Amino acid sequence: MMRHVRPGDGPAIADFYARLGPESRHSRFFGACHGIGELQAERFARARQRGGDGLLAIGDDGEVIGHLCLEPIEGCSGGRAEEVAVAVADLRRGHGLGRELLNAAIRSARRRGVLALEATMLTGNAPIHALLEHCGLPWSGHPLEPGRETIRIELAASLDSVA
């Protein structure tokens, strides 16, 4: 099941990130961490109240198995853009859950008039690159500081790519 985040979801989101393996957390947060704190979890849970969106994938046991967050980018040039970040439970990777989350996020962003999604990631993040290729979205990547890159997905150019 997939649904939008709600203000009371902070503890479930924190638990999800605590259950991710070290490599997954490193890819998501660019460093060693054991999870996220209560404040960050509540921030993720309230994404919709700040003009963005958030999605949770819920497993059959009721636990969060995927999270995607869309946050408005302050002062972006060239139109309205949002930062996108996604994480999928280690044992659920490679089964299409990330694609489902990203496609739902793209539909949400388009409904809200967002023109582009941007993400910062570790350079050469093959799973994210593969996810973008599977979704059929036009995207471009640009290096940032050593070890990091940013990608941009132009939503207006990909209106027919995602149903």
Which residues does each PLM region occupy?
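Long, contiguous binding/interaction regions
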Residues: M1-A163
